[in-house]
Every structure is written in C-alpha cells, then in structure tokens.
C-alpha cells in the first residue's frame, strides 16, 4: 500500500494518538453491539505489544446540546475495551486540560487510555460551536500536541474532515493507517481503482439518489451492475413500466432514464418482484413478473431475479455489494437479500466486499461473514469511496 501504516512506525516509548471508530449503539449506558470496538483491537494490541502508549479518541453519537452529553459518554466503551483486552484501561472524562495531560504523562509503555467523546467539543457552555465536527484548527493542534505519532484507524469517519482525524494529522509529522483502515483502502480502493474482472457490483437500498454517484463511477469500471431494493422502481418508471404503489423518486426518473441509456446492458434490473397490498409483513403478498399491479407495492426481488443475479455472479472475480434487495427487516421480504448473501459466501474464487448496514447484517445472520474477503465498517465512507471521491481522512495519512 502506498500509505504509511502502523507497522511502518517505531512505537516503543511513544505516545500514540489513535483515532478509532467506537461509535457504537448505546442506551442507558449499555452497549448494543461492540463490533466496532472489536474491529479496532488488532491495531490497539499491535501498538501496546510494541511498547507504545495508546491514547484513543472517538466520537459517539451526535451532541447538539449539553443534555446530550451524559448519555453519550465513552465510559462504558472504555469498560468494554478493558474487558476485551483483559487489562486495565484508563478513562479520562474530559477532552482537554490538565486532568487529561496529567493522565497521559502518567502512562507507561503498553498502557491504554480512552479520552471522553470528541464531540463533547461540539457544545461548549451551551453553545453549539462544532469544534470537533467543524475541524477547529486550534483543537486539532491541541490534540496533536498530546502525542508523538498519529494512527488513524477510523474508516467510518474517513469521509469527514474533523479535528480528530484531519485536524490532528495536519499537525503531525507522521500519520499512519491502522490495520482496519489499511484493509478498507486495500479492498474498496482496490475494487474501485484496479479490480480483477469480471467485476460485478450489486447495489440495493431505497433511493436512487443515494447511489447515483456510485452507479456513475462504477459504470466505467464494472462489467455488470445488478440493481435491487426500492430504487428498482424508479428505474421501472423510467422505462415506462407500471409500478403500482411502489416507492419511487419522481424527481429522479429523468436521471434514471439517462443512466439506463448510458449503461446499455451493463445495468441489470430485477425481472420479478414480491408485491404486497401494504407495507406490512403480514399483508397479503405474491410474486409477479414485470409490471407491479395497481394496489400493490414491490417489497423484494423475486426468485427469477435471484436466479439471474446468481448467473451473473457465478463467474465474477470481484464483487462489491452495498444495500439490501428488499425490505430486509420484514421476514417475508428478506429472501432476496438473504439469497444473495448466501450465494456470495460460495464464491471462493472472487474478492467479495460487502458494505452497508443491511447487507452486513444479512451476511452475519447467515453465518457467511468469514467466507467473504471484506466487510466494510464504514457506511457513508464506503459509499463515497465507491463514488471515487477523495476521502479527507485517507488523504491526510502520510505517503510511504
């Protein structure tokens, strides 16, 4: 990889500032899912095993007013990290000042410290000042002064220019990617910049508007783009097909027409749909080919579409999947998503890359996650990367 990584650094005795993505679901101090904490462990362990002092920064949720702060403290995250590492972790309930500086000065080689939620800096004295999320230059400079080197392992925020990623990096002589960031750059960056062919993209989700940039960028690179999910029916409308009460972005129909004209046979739409009388798992539903009848809405791709998609995927060497094929959270309309997820697990000769919450949930539910090459930890970041955009968090990492 052309970027500096944590394994290129001399860490012994160094204060290693680490931007991690510990933005986990938390309610009443209880963590709902610790995947993001677990994902950062290899980099944290590497730093402390090589004699570094790990000083971890992360945001947690959005803070718009003082009352948001208590429920979004990093304390439970530090406790969970301590359990996962099986060693004490120092938690500092502030993001700046003497208490934090003294705690950092007191660290021994191999120690771990978690500072308070970086977004506490977004609200000061009741004012919404956005020092962290607005990349306040003084804040980035201050945080940079607390460490010797900077490791960015938070791909989930790589598409954002914040004080805790870009701000710190711009005040450091060396910024390296952590192992998680390195993996994202290698797999997603590799798929976008230098894929092995045939390269097939599977794009789902509700809105064409969310995926336009990705479709545009991948039309030039992919051999086929398979479309599923709610956005299918904006394309159907663009072809003059009937869509019943299905989801449609009427203001995007002309754009969908342009994409269809440009794509030719590269863009593959579903040929059948599972349709229901209303948006309800228990509503009467059936499978129809082509047009969606009046009084029905399409909520999943049908079995013929699944078979056609599998036929395209079976010879692929690179596959990128982002977005569900239907209303995955309702069992009667989850089949398309689950079938695609299951099939990807059988493609042992291909690089298989999955991103997006529902697609990731599907492969985890099916138990095939470990059979895939890479599951992306970034929602918006992986989408923008697939769009071919320069991500500020990655651009700020030093080149080798």
From Swiss-Prot:
Which positions are annotated as binding ATP?
211, 329, 356-359
Question: Record's SUPFAM superfamilies?
Answer: Phosphoglycerate kinase (SSF53748)
Q: In which family does this protein belong, per the annotation?
A: Belongs to the phosphoglycerate kinase family.
Keywords assigned by UniProt, alphabetized: ATP-binding, Cytoplasm, Glycolysis, Kinase, Nucleotide-binding, Transferase
**Can you name one GO molecular function term for this protein?**
ADP binding
Pathway this chain belongs to: Carbohydrate degradation; glycolysis; pyruvate from D-glyceraldehyde 3-phosphate: step 2/5
**Entry superkingdom:** Bacteria
| Enzyme Commission (EC) number | 2.7.2.3
An example GO CC term for this entry is: cytosol
Q: Which organism is it from?
A: Levilactobacillus brevis (strain ATCC 367 / BCRC 12310 / CIP 105137 / JCM 1170 / LMG 11437 / NCIMB 947 / NCTC 947)
Subunit structure, per the record? Monomer.
Q: Which PANTHER family match?
A: PHOSPHOGLYCERATE KINASE, PHOSPHOGLYCERATE KINASE 1, CHLOROPLASTIC-RELATED
Q: What is this protein called?
A: Phosphoglycerate kinase
């Amino acid at each position: 990889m052309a970027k500096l990584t944590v394994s290129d650094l001399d860490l012994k005795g160094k204060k290693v500032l680490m931007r991690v993505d510990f933005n986990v679901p938390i309610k009443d101090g209880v963590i709902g899912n610790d995947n993001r904490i677990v994902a950062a462990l290899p980099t944290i362990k590497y730093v402390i095993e090589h004699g570094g002092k790990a000083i971890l920064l992360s945001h947690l949720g959005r803070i718009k007013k003082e009352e948001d702060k208590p429920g979004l403290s990093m304390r439970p995250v530090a406790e969970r990290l301590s359990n996962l590492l099986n060693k004490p972790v120092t938690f500092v309930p502030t993001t700046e000042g003497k208490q934090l500086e003294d705690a950092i000065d007191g660290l021994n080689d191999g120690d771990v410290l978690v500072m308070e939620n970086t977004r506490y800096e977004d609200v000061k004295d009741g004012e919404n000042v956005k020092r962290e999320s607005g990349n306040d230059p003084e804040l980035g400079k201050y945080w940079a002064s607390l460490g010797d080197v900077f490791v960015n392992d938070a791909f989930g925020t790589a598409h954002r220019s914040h004080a805790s990623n870009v701000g710190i990096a711009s005040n450091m002589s060396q910024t390296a990617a952590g192992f998680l960031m390195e993996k994202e750059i290698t797999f997603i960056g590799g798929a976008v910049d230098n894929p092995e062919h045939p390269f097939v993209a599977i794009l789902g989700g509700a809105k064409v508007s969310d995926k336009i940039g990705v479709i545009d960028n991948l039309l030039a690179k992919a051999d086929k783009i398979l479309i599923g999910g709610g956005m299918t029916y904006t394309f159907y409308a663009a072809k003059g097909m009937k869509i019943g009460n299905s989801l449609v972005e009427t203001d995007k129909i002309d754009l969908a027409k342009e994409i269809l004209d440009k794509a030719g046979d590269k863009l593959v739409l579903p040929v059948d749909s599972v349709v229901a009388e209303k948006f309800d798992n228990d509503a009467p539903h059936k499978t129809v080919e082509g047009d969606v009848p009046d009084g029905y809405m399409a909520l999943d791709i049908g079995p013929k579409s699944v078979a056609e998609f599998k036929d395209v995927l079976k010879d692929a060497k690179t596959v990128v999947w982002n977005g569900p094929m239907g209303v995955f959270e309702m069992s009667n309309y989850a089949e398309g998503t689950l079938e695609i997820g299951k099939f990807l697990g059988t493609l042992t000769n291909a690089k298989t890359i999955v991103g997006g919450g529902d697609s990731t949930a599907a492969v985890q539910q099916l138990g095939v996650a470990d059979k895939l090459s890479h599951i992306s930890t970034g929602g918006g970041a992986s989408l923008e990367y697939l769009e071919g955009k320069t991500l500020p968090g990655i651009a700020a990492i030093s080149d080798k």
